[in-house]
């Protein structure tokens, strides 16, 4: 897991006008929550934060008035049209502390020969991991799977120290027969019924 250091500045102005002024200065308004403390309002450097958030579940080392604190992103608000960062909520974490996070599910390998489709029922898994060792993603093999096969949450290998935080029998991936094959089978079935009459 990567750790990104960011210099944070305390924020005393609030509201839409203040947020716009902050963003015009290429900064992003943010709020840091956690550990029973009062929320801390800060601004973060926009470009560095944008680059950091490209890594899923990035661990941020924030320098807030000379005090280093670890945090993970909890909520990221983006402009719906232009995509720039509008606001970020961060959760304070400590080394050794367990947190629940969403990790992306990636696949490797090829399905069995034939026109099969892989459906991602869940694109992410909720897992519990140590705050400083959060996996960016998990990978599962789909090599040779045929129509009707499914992969459950418990079938996905997790890194050491990471556990599932969802029902282990939740379907994550399933293999479907291609629509063209199903349509051909239905047409053949209808033709047989019609010829019997």
Curated annotation (Swiss-Prot):
One Gene Ontology cellular component: cytosolic large ribosomal subunit
CDD domains in the record: Ribosomal_L25_TL5_CTC
Single GO MF annotation: structural constituent of ribosome
GO biological process: translation
Keyword vocabulary terms for this entry: Ribonucleoprotein, Ribosomal protein, RNA-binding, rRNA-binding
Pfam families given in the database record: Ribosomal_L25p, Ribosomal_TL5_C
Protein purpose: This is one of the proteins that binds to the 5S RNA in the ribosome where it forms part of the central protuberance.
Family: Belongs to the bacterial ribosomal protein bL25 family. CTC subfamily.
NCBIfam families membership: bL25_bact_ctc, PRK05618.2-1
Summary of subunit composition and partner proteins: Part of the 50S ribosomal subunit; part of the 5S rRNA/L5/L18/L25 subcomplex. Contacts the 5S rRNA. Binds to the 5S rRNA independently of L5 and L18.
Protein name from the UniProt record: Large ribosomal subunit protein bL25
Gene name of the record: rplY
